[in-house]
């Protein structure tokens, strides 16, 4: 009996896809945040650099060297009562062109009472024809706090690449005290470069970013606005439902990163990861 060529090709494709998962939780012991129940699998790893002054630092490493179509990665972090952690990435994450099957990335963050999570990865760069579905689920206790940022760059701007085809789906859900306080799904597909050129979407920007600050209110927004220098790109801030949000867009990752760092510096006393400052 001869094997079905289409089925054989699908099996080969699946066998060559990267898989990776990291799960760990944190506990406050004798006033020090310590990791607990660490699990790693596949090509996703986590490293814990030298202790920072405030809580624990964790850095994710994708040993596959990037994300391609059909890859699947998952990150789960639970911060126990009173613990503090800053989560970052070793480098900008590259998402390569995909023939059809999108990559999948699932992130779940949980923080108990009085715990704090800073989610501060470096930017994600989508190559032309890249396809990725990302899901971010955040569950905070009423007295927990969060500082989160994400930067996405469409196309390799340094070499003049334009994203003429691709798919980007980004689903965020934020719960606080068991209540859903923020839900958003961003979907861009087809000629993404053409869509970003439209004035009502990004007005030609190729890098976009979002920062979430919990808790946050109008007073925090005004304090950030008064302290900020002139932005290199465009930025907007608002607050509702007990959290503050900043949106960014710029012509390149460096400009957006500078604007993001300025906002994060005003919004929180939590130091940025050292890799952000290199």
From Swiss-Prot:
The keyword Cytoplasm applies. One of its GO terms (cellular component) is cytoplasm. It is found in: Cytoplasm. Its main location: cytoplasm. InterPro entries: UreD. Keywords: Chaperone, Cytoplasm, Nickel insertion. GO terms for molecular function: nickel cation binding. UreD, UreF and UreG form a complex that acts as a GTP-hydrolysis-dependent molecular chaperone, activating the urease apoprotein by helping to assemble the nickel containing metallocenter of UreC. The UreE protein probably delivers the nickel. PANTHER family: UREASE ACCESSORY PROTEIN D. HAMAP family: UreD (MF_01384). Required for maturation of urease via the functional incorporation of the urease nickel metallocenter. This is Urease accessory protein UreD 1. It comes from Bradyrhizobium sp. (strain ORS 278). The lineage of its organism: Bacteria, Pseudomonadati, Pseudomonadota, Alphaproteobacteria, Hyphomicrobiales. The gene is ureD1.
């Amino acid at each position: 009996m001869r094997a079905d060529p289409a089925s054989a090709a699908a099996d080969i494709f699946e066998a060559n896809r990267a898989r990776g998962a990291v799960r760990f939780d944190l506990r406050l012991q004798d006033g020090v945040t310590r990791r607990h129940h660490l699990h790693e699998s596949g090509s996703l790893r986590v490293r814990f650099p030298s202790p920072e002054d405030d809580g624990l630092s964790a850095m994710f490493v994708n040993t596959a060297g990037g994300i391609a179509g059909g890859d699947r990665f998952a990150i789960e972090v639970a911060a126990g009562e009173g613990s503090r952690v800053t989560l970052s990435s070793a480098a900008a994450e590259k998402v390569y062109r995909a023939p059809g099957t999108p990559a999948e990335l699932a992130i779940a963050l949980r923080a108990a009472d009085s715990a704090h999570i800073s989610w501060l990865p470096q930017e994600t760069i989508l190559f032309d024809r890249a396809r990725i579905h990302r899901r971010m689920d955040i569950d905070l206790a009423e007295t927990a706090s969060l500082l989160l940022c994400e930067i996405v760059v469409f196309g390799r701007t340094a070499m003049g690449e334009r994203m003429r085809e691709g798919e980007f789906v980004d689903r965020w859900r934020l719960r606080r005290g068991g209540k859903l306080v923020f839900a958003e799904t961003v979907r861009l597909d087809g000629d993404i470069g053409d869509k970003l050129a439209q004035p009502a979407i990004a007005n030609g920007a190729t890098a976009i970013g979002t920062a979430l600050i919990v808790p946050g209110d109008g007073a925090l927004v005004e304090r950030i606005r008064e302290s900020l220098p002139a932005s290199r790109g465009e930025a907007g801030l608002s607050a509702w439902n007990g959290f503050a949000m900043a949106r960014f867009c710029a012509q390149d990752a460096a400009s957006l990163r500078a604007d993001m760092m300025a906002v994060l510096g005003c919004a929180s006393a939590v130091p940025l990861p050292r890799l952000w400052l290199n």
